Amino acid sequence: MSLNLFWFLPTHGDGHYLGTEEGARPVDYGYLQQIAQAADRIGFTGVLIPTGRSCEDAWLVAAAMIPVTQRLKFLVALRPSVVSPTVAARQAATLDRLSNGRALFNLVTGSDPTELAGDGVFLDHTERYEASAEFTRVWRRLLEGDTVTYEGKHIRVRDAKLYFPPVQQPRPPLYFGGSSDVAQDLAAEQVDLYLTWGEPPEQVKEKIEQVRAKAAAHGRKVRFGIRLHVIVRETNQEAWQAADRLISHLDDDTIAKAQAALAKTDSVGQHRMASLHNGKRENLEISPNLWAGVGLVRGGAGTALVGDGPTVAARINEYADLGIDSFILSGYPHLEEAYNVGELLFPHLDVAIPEIPQPRPLQVQGEAVANEFIPRKTAQS
């Protein structure tokens, strides 16, 4: 099975070390362009663009990177409860059209009550997933060309439709990650690819089996992906030394503050990540070559595969054997580590290198009439 390898645009900051300004670098348009173009040339399938108040806006960053790349896809966040499904569908179709079919979408329900309140969202964990399920039903149908009337607990729309369809048919793929039961239920019913953070293989296997069974109950099949950091070097010793350097400026106070902040979220996945290290610097290799040091101060993906190219490739293939075909990777600093992965890891994997999409013929149409319908050229009889 060929693997889809993604990279990451660090719109929330980048550098050589975690938890310090030492070795940090400014993340501006030029730097993001460097990373995107490197990922494009190396052969990554796409890049994940993070979302949240500590990040630049993912949609604007993706739009800015489209003209400077050729084949790279952009995985951007859909935020139910923050934006309506109708507006989100129009945005998604536009991004897909502007990129000639290089748009992918990641459903993000949110987990930080403080950040959500700042965005005007006051739903609890279960309610957010209810709203996300309703949002996704409407969003999918609109992109598939339906005119949608929907009456739900959280979402109500009447005669909603898109005038400009996406390039990818029937619609761009939808990604989603969540570890709770309600999250898995949503994935089983609605999404195309279920994501997990980088837990040990036995834990990932359990989640995959649960989601696969729930999807089968809906008569569906779901693909699987995993989100991991990587530290790959020419030798295993060099890789582990690089891992130690990454957290060499962390002090106990910074770790404690980070863990206290992350504990406030209601994310089951975040709590599972925290349980892998329990805020302690000792015994961070939680599974062969799987290192939990990143999670001492970083929310979300908190583990890294560490080793030389053949070793990291072997661990990736262990996850692939569980049914995972997509790997969303990152490493510090993201520009240099992209090249490390391309040069030291890619040769040891069966990597699906994306092709440059060819221009597609556009449908002839006139200006919208009274904002109600679009005149189109009719076939001659």
Curated annotation (Swiss-Prot):
Gene3D superfamilies hit by this protein: Luciferase-like domain
GO terms for MF: alkanesulfonate monooxygenase activity
Coiled coil ranges: none
Role description: Catalyzes the desulfonation of aliphatic sulfonates.
PANTHER family: ALKANESULFONATE MONOOXYGENASE, ALKANESULFONATE MONOOXYGENASE-RELATED
Species in which this protein is naturally found: Enterobacter sp. (strain 638)
Entry keyword Oxidoreductase: yes
Keywords for the protein's UniProt record, in alphabetical order: Flavoprotein, FMN, Monooxygenase, Oxidoreductase
General remark: FMNH(2) which is absolutely required for this enzymatic reaction, is provided by SsuE.
Highest taxon of source: Bacteria
GO biological process: alkanesulfonate catabolic process
E.C. number: 1.14.14.5
Protein family (similarity comment): Belongs to the SsuD family.
InterPro entries: Alkanesulphonate_mOase_FMN-dep, Luciferase-like_dom, Luciferase-like_sf, SsuD_RutA_monooxygenase
Protein name (record): Alkanesulfonate monooxygenase
Assembly with partners or alone: Homotetramer.
Catalytic activity: an alkanesulfonate + FMNH2 + O2 = an aldehyde + FMN + sulfite + H2O + 2 H(+)
Organism lineage: Bacteria, Pseudomonadati, Pseudomonadota, Gammaproteobacteria, Enterobacterales
CDD domains in the cross-refs: Alkanesulfonate_monoxygenase
